[in-house]
Amino acid sequence: MLPALLGLSREGTDSAILPGTVRGVLLLCGIELTLFTAAFGLAAWLARFRWAELYLTTPIRWWSWPRAIAWSIALRVGIGMLLAGSLGVAQLVRGKPITDLDSLRPKVEAMVDVAALQDPLYLALMLTLVSFVLAGLREELWRAGMIALLGRLAPGWFGGRWGPWFALIPVAILFGLGHTPQGWVGVAATTGIGLGLGAILLFHRSLPEAVLAHGFFNATTFALLPWIAHLIPKLQAP
């Protein structure tokens, strides 16, 4: 529940969640990873999770890397189709075209200082430490832990062979609510991303596969943001 509560608490704030300096990002990563390691480690110890329950028994193979890239592309295409379809339905319901497209995009500037991405060192941190560790590893461990926990708490619903797939739904919703600062379009998009990443986790029964796909998805987003900012000036920090 904590990611959702933190996301809701930041709704409407103007500053980006990620600091706009290299030092700030390193400090934030250190604090966040330390707190998460302590909290997740304690929870895993109390719950006595097995490695298999967290999908940590499948090693990374060389083909895991290109496959993760392919999954990240598929996720991006899928989310694009979801948003485009939602736009079409909204226009059909309204009976007229929606001209204010800025209101129909995730507010990524609430997560990261887009102007700071012009700094090569800052961008490098986003593409590596933030994408694959702070976001990828941490959030996929959280997802695997939540699925395992739901299976323990409600085995009739979330246990057995298909239960973890049903558990993806509430876990993805919590994941989306953790991105509330991006607006409700961002919540919908990240909920869809959460479903996709959870499906990768369960399909391959491999946490590393999901971490890599998550990391490549985020890294591509950060790499494209400076270019997109030239097309959408509102992305630039005030």
Feature annotation, model-predicted:
Residues 37, 41, 84, 222-226:
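Membrane-embedded alpha-helical segments of multi-pass transporters/permeases
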Residues 4-9, 81-97:
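Helix-to-loop transition at the C-terminal end of transmembrane segments
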